[in-house]
Amino acid sequence: MSTKALKKKQHINVQHVNSSSDEGSEKKVVVVVNSVKPKFSMLNLSDEDDDKSDQDENEDKKDSESEESEEEEEEEEIEKEKPQAKEQLSSKQQKQKQQQQASKKKQAKKKQQQKKKQQQQEKDELELNEIEKSSPPIILSEIEIKDKEFRELFKINTVNLNPDNELKKLFGCKSSDIKGQKKKSVHHFKKKNYIFVQPKPEWPDVMGGFMVMEICNDDKVPSSPTNATTTTTTTTTTTNTVSPKLKSQQQSLDGINYFKIKWGQTYSNIQEEFYLALTTHDPMSLVEIIRYHPYHIDSLLQLGQVCLQTADYSKAGDFVEMAVFAFENVFHHLFNPLNGNCRFEYRHDQNKSCFLAIFRFIQIIGRRACHRTALELCKILLTWDYSDPLYVRLIIDYYSIRSKQYRFLVDLFTKLKTITPTNQGDLSLLPNFCYSAALAMYHLEREKSTTTTSTSTSTSSSKSSSVEESSDILLQKALISFPMVLQPLLEKLKTNFSIPKNGKIITLENDPFFKDDPLEKRIDHLVTLFVERNYQCWQTPEILDWLKSNVIIVLDKVAAKHPMVKQLSDSIKAEYETVNQEVFDHLVLSEYSDVINRLTPDIIEAMHAEGFRDILPQRDPNQAPPQHLRRGGIGQGFQIHQRNQQQQRRVQQQLRQLQQQQQQNLQHQQQQPLEPLLQENPDYTGPANPVLNFLHSLLPWNDPSIQRERQLAATQGTQQPAPGFLDDYVDFSDEDENEN
């Protein structure tokens, strides 16, 4: 389109906007156009020029008329496009209105739901208030109060249960195999999130049916009468539609479930084979069980201990992890080991192997420097069984200090004062807790002194310090209660405390107070366990200086006959007076420390020669696991080797038959008399001298073939002439003549 046409189009649009499109205005416009003088009249030109100008005007008129016709066509097109644009705008506006209406409806629904929730909460609060008014006040016992404090203190974080996260913090992802392990797709273990152990791709497949976890609430402790009254009142006052808040509170009154493992017949038979294998004292018999039943827990744990004695730590860890994985695959759907409401008691015989698998797993993880994960597993074992049958109290202090959970250890020692709510043994009667709690408080005090705190934190710390005892006092009480710990601890650290006194050098640990044992070696086993496990936590120079200063203070108090010395020593003597040393003898040192009784190299070489090197059960790579067997359970290793079982039995039978034949041949040879190496020929009639015998054998008539012919002739009755000297003579000259 030309510039003139665009200008005229703009002019027309302006006229439309001003609403001056009537006929009168058009006439006026025409008049105005006609009244305008020609442009060339102002130049005073001649008539010819006027004629030319008239021609030019006519041409201009024609051009203008053609342009006007084009403009009219364009206007018509624009007018046609206007309703389409209006329709598009109207559709967009309708969509926007619909969206606004939908958003308003959603907001209204949300407001209604919020109002309903508020009304329901108000109703619940009113009902709870009525229940509290109508029911007698609930008086919590000391055990229930301790149970609440215990659950708050022993909360378990699932993030800390993964040892890979701790290894990442220590070494990074590049320096470990974690990054490569995650890339491997374990398709037959992928459908379930595991808590303790993530299975490896080379492990055998699993299946269910060999053992099951079931609820055994018959062993549950009966609820108190207060709980019974509260539950009855809630059921009578509430309607049929009970709110979820009331349901949760009703369940929290008595929400503890007891679980136990139940073996199937096949697993019981495998267990009998395991007991028979133990009587042989041959680890290869256990390997034979694992080959056909790769998830038998007791066999896996026993082989793990054998691998530790042969210094094969990787295989020991694999065996223990497989045992934990087998236990985790039979979890009940209500069994949640992290809530603290599930009990898995050790007193049931079929629970012991699974309980022991978690305990051995703690040792394996602790040797890998995953101390925080080991601490969380210790908490789980204590929540499963309050009686602490495996003496987790002897190792939980070590993992608390190594994982820098000082506040947890101090609160456990000073607030709870017992390892579990139902356990009556005070933690101040254990040497490991007395010394470890003092060390944890020492680290907390150092953290407070080094960090700059705000006013709020300083006030809170002053309140806590007024209630809690300082690290110096805790350590002095530990030294007074258990003075026999100092000397073996310093010997393990390869140091001594010596000070100059009266011109002489005196060693503090050789003082009679620390050297003499008032308990008469009743707790020597506990002292040895503590020293072998925790000596690494005391080897820094700052801690040794702190220990030395408190040893000097204790000796001064002993010399001054401070009343605290007599009070603490009398309480310890009264506690351990009736305890024999045999009580702690079953606590094996290797179970509670890194000390392992290893086998001699010649025994290890003999075991490797017998095939003890490659004993881990492997998954069959040629056979894919069936889809319905990928969701959990144990024992599919039996199906893996089931197709090869008959062949192996045939091979074994053939070997037995060969062995029996060899034994029979040996017996037959032993029964027969031995034949002499040189036997005399009875038919020989020659001289006895060996030289003459040799010359005699060279004679032609003593040829054995001739003698045989004579024997044949004698038997047939025919007589042959006696051999002559020229019998074998050949005349070659006659043969030459015949040829010629």
Curated annotation (Swiss-Prot):
Signal peptide residue numbers: none
Biased composition range(s): Acidic residues: 46-58, 65-78, 728-740
One Gene Ontology cellular component: nucleus
Molecular function GO terms recorded: DNA binding; transcription corepressor activity
Keyword annotations of the record: Coiled coil, Cytoplasm, DNA-binding, Nucleus, Repressor, Transcription, Transcription regulation
InterPro entries the record matches: TCF25/Rqc1
Entry's family note: Belongs to the TCF25 family.
Protein's name according to its UniProt entry: Ribosome quality control complex subunit TCF25
Organism of provenance: Dictyostelium discoideum (Social amoeba)
Species classification: Eukaryota, Amoebozoa, Evosea, Eumycetozoa, Dictyostelia
